[in-house]
């Protein structure tokens, strides 16, 4: 791994999404009951995104989703290992009055636990604060690694998730923190 550089991730970078490897071994998933999290043991392998087609779990679908976020004014920050995308985070400011959304945060397998996710999250928190938001929400994949990452960053389960986010991701863990 070379020196990681951080810079705005712009629409011209969208094809780099194919650099990301989302594979992950998942032994524990969480189910959210208000502010309580129920741990469920499991035996799951999260596969990579599909290289072909436009289905829900394809690179094309994720690229289109990120394109929509960027077109709507979201700010994205990329972590690059040379020309290779190692991670990306997307911030939607003012989702609600004073509340930002961490709409997407992904660090490629092989780069996890290296500080990239922390740096992306911290930088996006700072940008949200500078933009006038005092709280941030995230809909997190319910895997133990992901939930622990956010909890270590100060996020806590929301008693009542935002309906518009819950509708999109009902199985996710809906978290928030004050900035």
Residue ranges and their predicted role:
Residues 11, 19-99, 103, 108, ...:
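Acetyl-CoA-dependent GNAT
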Residues 16-19, 119, 123, 174:
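Alpha-helical elements of Rossmann-like donor-binding domains used by nucleotide-donor carbohydrate transfer enzymes
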Residues 58, 137-141, 156-173:
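Conserved catalytic-core motifs of GNAT/GCN5-like acyltransferases
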Residues 106, 142-144:
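Active-site-proximal loop/turn and secondary-structure-junction residues that shape catalytic pockets
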Residues 107, 113-128, 151-152:
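Conserved acetyl-CoA-binding loop-helix of GNAT-fold acetyltransferases
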């Amino acid at each position: 791994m070379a020196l990681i550089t951080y810079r705005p991730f712009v629409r011209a970078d969208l094809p780099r999404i194919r650099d990301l490897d989302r594979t992950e071994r998942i032994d524990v998933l969480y189910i959210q009951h208000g502010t309580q999290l129920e741990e469920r043991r499991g035996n799951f392998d999260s596969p990579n995104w599909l290289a072909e087609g436009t289905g829900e779990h394809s690179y094309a679908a994720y690229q289109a989703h990120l394109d929509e976020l960027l077109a709507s004014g979201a700010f994205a920050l990329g972590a690059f290992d040379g020309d290779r995308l190692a991670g990306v985070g997307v911030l939607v400011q003012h989702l609600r009055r004073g509340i930002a959304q961490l709409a997407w945060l992904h660090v490629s397998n092989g780069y996890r636990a290296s500080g990239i996710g922390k740096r992306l999250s911290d930088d996006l928190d700072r940008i949200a604060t500078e933009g006038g938001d005092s709280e941030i929400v995230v809909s997190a994949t319910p895997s133990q690694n992901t939930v622990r990452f956010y909890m270590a960053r100060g996020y806590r389960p929301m008693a009542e998730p935002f309906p518009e986010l819950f509708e999109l991701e009902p199985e996710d863990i809906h978290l928030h923190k004050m900035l």
